[in-house]
UniProtKB/Swiss-Prot annotation:
InterPro entries: Ribosomal_bS6, Ribosomal_bS6_sf, Ribosomal_S6_plastid/chlpt, Transl_elong_EF1B/ribsomal_bS6. Disulfide bonds: none annotated. This is Small ribosomal subunit protein bS6. The gene is rpsF. The keyword 4Fe-4S does not apply. It comes from Geobacter sp. (strain M21). One of its GO terms (molecular function) is structural constituent of ribosome.
């Protein structure tokens, strides 16, 4: 049964373009060789790591999305683990197709203050004064 997966892997930041292209081709070949359906490969660029990994304070991130089965995940992770250029990787199964949420409408500052004042007026109880004659 084919399921959708995504893998993020981090490589050493000092790799050249040819080495990165060879690694990306190798990853795509693993997916194709195991009858997977390759969807997307994105280069997220070099970023600072939360903590140094193998004395590297930075890493180059790659995002991979594909359809396949559990055997494909096992083989892909095995190949990433054996490659010295890859310093970390993580694969997860996606439940459904991920859709970006729609942006919330932005209110201007004047509209926001008027709405807050209107809400405060409706929520606050009206002050009543009673006069008592003696």
């Amino acid at each position: 049964m084919s399921r959708m997966y995504e893998t993020i892997y981090i490589v050493q930041p000092d790799l050249g373009d040819e080495e990165i292209k060879a690694l990306s081709t190798k990853v795509q070949d693993v997916v194709a060789g195991m009858n997977g359906d390759f969807k997307r490969l994105e280069d997220w660029g070099t970023r600072k790591l939360a903590y140094p990994i193998n004395k590297n304070p930075r890493g180059r991130y790659f995002y991979l999305r594909f359809d396949g089965d559990s055997g494909l995940i096992a083989e892909l992770e095995r190949r990433l683990r054996l490659d010295d250029k890859v310093i970390r990787y993580q694969s997860v199964k996606l439940e459904t197709e991920v859709v970006a949420p729609a942006a919330a409408p932005v209110k201007s500052a004047e509209e926001g203050t008027e709405e807050v004042a209107a809400e405060a007026a409706t929520e606050a109880p009206a002050e009543t004064t009673t006069t008592v004659e003696v």
